[in-house]
Amino acid sequence: LDIKKGETVCLIGTNGSGKSTLLKLMTKIIYPNEGTIETHGKLTSLLELGAGFHQDFTGRENIYFNAAVFGLTKAKIEKRVDDIIEFSELGEFIDNPVRTYSSGMYMRLAFSVAINVDADILLIDEILSVGDEHFQNKCFKKMLELKKQGKTMVFVTHSMESVKRLCDRTIWLYNGKIRMDGDTKEVVEEYVKETR
């Protein structure tokens, strides 16, 4: 499986088909039993709500912590912190410990940080299915903007509408294997026919 620089690829399949496992392999959270995984470029991911956040830190402290983990200097973080907070729309809650956040608030903070760490590759695993419709739409618009900038994105979702709107290429996984890989319209049509 090769994903080219600048591609926006969606992974689809029923629960348990291997979509999230593939993303975890790409981020090296887990390692393959055989074969190798290579990534070229700086990678950021949104895989599980709350992953990478220190629960006792405030949202603001977590911005600094996460951005530093991704290699941003304190000076770069200082320049971006207001943009991150503004995009997240967390307002005064940014100074509360993240353990007090709802799932939607976690998603707001995680997405806002992820789009501001200068990553070349963005992996997103269904995290955008939480939160309110307004913020989901805002994230979707930002992803379209990142796509136009030539960022590489791999996106897992069960929303076929999102797949059709965002992805150049779709990979249908079934029992850990690629069932179909190609043009989004064709793959989605086959997937919908088969899973009805």
For the regions a language model picked out, list residue spans one by one.
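The feature captures the beta-strand-to-loop junction immediately N-terminal to the Walker
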Residues: 12-14
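Conserved ABC ATPase "signature" region
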Residues: 64, 76-93
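Conserved ABC ATPase "signature" C-loop
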Residues: 175-176, 191
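ABC ATPase "signature
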Residues: 181-182
